[in-house]
Amino acid sequence: MWSMEGMNERLKAAAAKLLLTEDCFYLYDEAGIRSRARALTRSFPSAKILYSLKANPFLPVARVMKEEGFGADAASAAEVRLAVSLGMMKEEIQYSAPGKRAKDIRETLELATLVADSAGEIARIEEAAKGKGIHVSIGLRIHPSFGFAGGRGEPSKFGIDEEEAITLLNDWHFPHLSPAGIHVHLKSQELSEEALALYYENVLLMAERLGRTEAMELSFVNLGSGIEIPMDPEDEEMDLALLEKAFAALAGPFHDRFLKARLFLESGRYAPGPSGFYVTKALDRKVSEGKVFLITAGTMHGFLRPALARLVEKYDETGHPALCEPLFSGARAFPISTLREGNPETVTITGNLCTAADIIAEDITLPRLAEGDGIVIGNAGAYAATLSPFAFSSLERPKEFLLKETGDLEGV
């Protein structure tokens, strides 16, 4: 397994303090989040970056991202309301998700830029705007004719096919709506700067094609996310300097042709992901047939993905299970460490649910632990609490805390 890089002495001290009163919890590092957020804004000065609220909507974390100048990538009406509560303006909030209900559309029509996911959804937004007696600008989520790495695109549940979008825009019959921009997202977790640069180039070329249609008033292009964080010991951090250079070379000429078009990128899990940790307490220790088990608090129900990664690896017969973001990012995506030193031993870490599936690591080497000792799981700052089945067995939900730069702990 990985060594526990990133949990500095401040974080370890905060975790040890919380373990006096909590059996399991999420701990987010404000300094780490801000550092990574600023790395993004420095690298893409010509783009507005949207924080992907679905990655981690914990209010103190979302507030940090707002303070760093990020807008919001919202995937629900509730996330739109969260962004508004943080003080974000309508132009900074993009609501892009398939299957928006009429209720969702009515509630958010004047709070965010709605990005229509289908022709039917355009009609529903038109109906809502007509009912309110207003005219609104919207975006269109486009399913490109190309794939992420070039070549022909594949069928998708997301967006309007590029060819269909061109037809719609050349025969626009929605008098209360103006198509003002596009949103594209084809892949999460890409570590290749060259692959991302090619994707950006293809999206901007497509934006030019759509910008030449009758109805499109191209005022924004949202290129989605894709910038990966390391989720395997062999992964290297994305070289943002290389990506910055490639993006600038594309953005400059595009802005020359479309002076009013604003470029957006989505942050995905980049800022909070490596800056979050799940800490759980050893509740019991037992030996069965010579095998050591540590029973910990709130493991599978508190942080699902490590247990899910083990299940996928165990039951996949190929030995190379396909990634399925954000649920499965690889078998070695979550480094495990302890808050104490000691003689090494081989242990299996399980949770306290009444299911044999509640195992997060099997036969790993850790310092010998006793009841009450803490175990730390990394890469828990994004798609962690939001994806976990807290209601399982009616156990207590793990709390979340932000370790502020001042040293204070903030919860909700």
Predicted feature residues:
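A charged N-terminal "starter" segment
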Residues: M1-K130, I134-V136, F174, S178, ...
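Electropositive phosphate-/nucleotide-binding environments in soluble metabolic enzymes
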Residues: L27-R34, A55, L59, A74-A77, ...
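Conserved, mostly hydrophobic/aromatic
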Residues: I33, K54, S76, T108, ...
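Structural preference for beta-strand elements that scaffold enzyme active sites
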Residues: K48-L50, G69-G71, K90-Q94, T113-V115, ...
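Active-site-proximal loop/turn and secondary-structure-junction residues that shape catalytic pockets
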Residues: A55-P57, A78, G99-R101, S118-G120, ...
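Conserved residues at the C-terminal ends of beta-strands
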Residues: S96, D117, H185, G224, ...
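Active-site loop/helix belt of alpha/beta enzymes
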Residues: F146-D284, S393-L395
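Charged (often Lys/Glu-rich) extended helix/loop segments that serve as interaction or gating elements
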Residues: F258-V412
